[in-house]
Amino acid sequence: MRSQWLKNRKNDKTPTQMYYAKNGIITEEMRYVAKIEQMDAEILRSEVARGKTIIPANINHTNLVPMGIGRSLKCKINSNIGSSSVSSGVEEEVEKLKISIKYGADTVMDLSTGGDLNEIRTQIIKNSTVPIGTVPIYQIIHDVGSIENLTISQMLKTIENQAIQGVSYFTIHAGFLLEFMPLVAKRKMGIVSRGGSLMATWMMKNHKENPFFTAFDEILEICAKYDVSLSLGDSLRPGCIYDASDAAQISELKILGDLARRAWTKNVQVMIEGPGHVPFNEIASNMQLERVLCDDAPFYVLGPLPTDIGAGYDHITSAIGGTMAAFSGASMLCYVTPKEHLGLPNAKDVREGIVAHKIAAHIADVALGKKGAIERDHAMSDARYNFDWNKQFELSLDPDRAKEYHDETLPQEVFKEAEFCSMCGPKFCAYKISREISKNSCEFYKECK
């Protein structure tokens, strides 16, 4: 779909969606996203121009279907996949990608740290119609062997190679400054971000400033060349509710706002990454603070998890916090799986995490009156009341699971037209009884049509 669009713009010096938007141009990607979001294309262009919405769409990811992330759009979901040094490979990660897309992930991040990282990423991008994000520091360390060997030249080389491959957004841990290290010492759990912990190690060993911060202008040049969006990473996100909203977290958030403004001057799209573990009563204020400090750049949050004791069920704790975050202004939720804090998720865990967070995002969209959200709920109500079982499966966020559960007790096709399920049976079904009452009332009063 994008090949012809990109061909028409191949000679443009700054091919970013933000550049076009600032110059009054509504790109094909903007028109597509506006149609999907049921909004005016000119309004969307203005949002992109002002940094309030991003359309992550690397010019080298030609089979990508455009999507947008921003507070005025429906809340989006990201799925994390990726190999580790002890588990998974190319086929497994492509399978996780396909599961992610099937169950509704709007973007997917490849967080691979083991195996042939370039081949894994190549196959993921090749098979993906959604934007792919990465955390470049993982490959940088993988390639140089240890954090001590990291150089800015190697860092920039890896970042550009990933941009050439077609990565649509980078998580860059540029907001964690050397001066924040004393704030970390006051925490119960220190640094829980992998990228953040690596940056801390490098800064302490070299007694120098964060290299991502130092080379930020060069990173922006690469991003502008390929239209790679930046996801400014929260290295100091709280890893437990005790550390939530502390000086370390807020100090970094202020720097992320400064970096976002620098990126906008170079026509690079930006979203801000957020917490983390946050008590439920602090989630809304965290969302509002980001809007103030980061000029309403899209907020991309991990959870937040409002409790620390949900091990094995953290997709639920995260979805609870994510609902409040989305309602309070978050633009995208990073899913959490049941394996969070316990191990590398498999395809089944990916499915569970995505659906839980699709539910959270949808609840917020309905509450906020986002266009096209509540209509699906109304259609489901009609299907339920009319015993249209196949329609109910189709409208569910996880159609396969809905059908599986129904068919556990009533698998025969004849029961797809039955006016009851196995919960109440034919005599005690409230819907059926209610329909009869309604029918009889209409006949008695002769007022119904």
UniProtKB/Swiss-Prot annotation:
Coiled coil: none annotated. Its EC number is 4.1.99.17. Substrate binds at N80, M109, Y138, H173, S193, R194, G195, D234, S235, L236, R237, E273, Y300. Keywords: 4Fe-4S, Iron, Iron-sulfur, Lyase, Metal-binding, S-adenosyl-L-methionine, Thiamine biosynthesis, Zinc. One of its GO terms (molecular function) is carbon-carbon lyase activity. Binds 1 [4Fe-4S] cluster per subunit. The cluster is coordinated with 3 cysteines and an exchangeable S-adenosyl-L-methionine. It is an enzyme of class 4 (lyase). Pathway: Cofactor biosynthesis; thiamine diphosphate biosynthesis. It comes from the Bacteria. InterPro entries: ThiC, ThiC/Bza_core_dom, ThiC/BzaA/B. It catalyses: 5-amino-1-(5-phospho-beta-D-ribosyl)imidazole + S-adenosyl-L-methionine = 4-amino-2-methyl-5-(phosphooxymethyl)pyrimidine + CO + 5'-deoxyadenosine + formate + L-methionine + 3 H(+). PANTHER family: PHOSPHOMETHYLPYRIMIDINE SYNTHASE, CHLOROPLASTIC (PTHR30557:SF1), THIAMINE BIOSYNTHESIS PROTEIN THIC (PTHR30557). Catalyzes the synthesis of the hydroxymethylpyrimidine phosphate (HMP-P) moiety of thiamine from aminoimidazole ribotide (AIR) in a radical S-adenosyl-L-methionine (SAM)-dependent reaction. HAMAP family: ThiC. Homodimer. This is Phosphomethylpyrimidine synthase. It comes from Campylobacter hominis (strain ATCC BAA-381 / DSM 21671 / CCUG 45161 / LMG 19568 / NCTC 13146 / CH001A). The gene is thiC.
